[in-house]
């Protein structure tokens, strides 16, 4: 048994308040992309379908002896380049292929996890993505926003601070709205440029009445896992 899933283009920020946002397939007027997976998710194929040819062509094939997760395919340069999210080396990372599925280069690598691609600036050839586990002195589940060039160079952290960050990148990839919080801190929203420079504080929650009523933040603590090593 297998499952087919249509790849679609990322939603634009200018459409975020629309009741019905347009869903557009990833591709062009003649071709679209889909993911074909086995029921056990040991086998995942990224495929293309050309209108009128009535055939599904595998472009990127993933084979593992364990369950795999997937993320949406990013299509660049008029369909001539593809960015794939994959867990093939045990960590979730990004890889660049040409339209025929030939490997071009690895974009990210290391003992950390790429969560999602938020924006690809095709003109500048820069990818904005969220990831966690890169900062050893922070909670490994806290996500940050990063940028990296399509060729794998220029990796840079955009958001800062030991918080869980929920960033949004504008459609032109010039600005970032970073909503960040932690269980023992006051939530805050700030405006950054695409290099991580803080431009302004948009809003910081007011907990004064809550604190006056006797509220106390939960206390964070650290314990060892069953292996006696992992915090």
Protein language model regions, located:
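Non-catalytic accessory segments flanking enzyme active sites
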Residues: 1-12, 19-25, 29-37, 42-48, ...
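Repeat-blade elements of multi-bladed beta-propeller folds
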Residues: 74-79, 121-130
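Beta-propeller blade termini and top-face loops
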Residues: 131, 141-144
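Generic long, charged, amphipathic alpha-helical segments
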Residues: 137-138
């Amino acid at each position: 048994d297998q499952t087919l899933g249509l790849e679609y283009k990322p939603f634009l920020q200018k459409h975020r308040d629309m009741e019905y946002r347009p869903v557009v397939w990833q591709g062009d007027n003649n071709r679209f992309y889909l993911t074909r997976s086995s029921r056990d998710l040991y086998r995942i194929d990224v495929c293309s379908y050309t209108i009128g040819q009535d055939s599904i062509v595998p472009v990127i094939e993933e084979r593992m002896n364990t369950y795999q997760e997937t993320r949406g395919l990013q299509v660049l340069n008029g369909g001539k380049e593809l960015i794939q999210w994959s867990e093939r080396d045990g960590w979730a990372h990004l890889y660049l292929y040409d339209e025929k599925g030939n490997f071009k280069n690895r974009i990210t690598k290391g003992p950390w996890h790429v969560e999602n691609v938020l924006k690809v600036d095709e003109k500048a050839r820069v990818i904005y993505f969220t990831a966690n586990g890169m900062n050893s002195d922070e909670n490994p589940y806290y996500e940050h926003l990063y940028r990296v060039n399509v060729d794998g160079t220029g990796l840079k952290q955009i958001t800062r601070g030991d918080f869980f960050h929920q960033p949004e990148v504008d459609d032109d990839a010039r600005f970032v709205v970073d909503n960040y919080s932690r269980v023992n801190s006051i939530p805050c929203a700030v405006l950054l440029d695409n290099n991580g420079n803080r431009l302004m504080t948009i809003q910081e929650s007011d907990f004064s009445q809550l604190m006056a009523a006797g509220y106390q933040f939960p206390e964070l603590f650290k314990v060892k896992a069953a292996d006696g090593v992992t915090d």
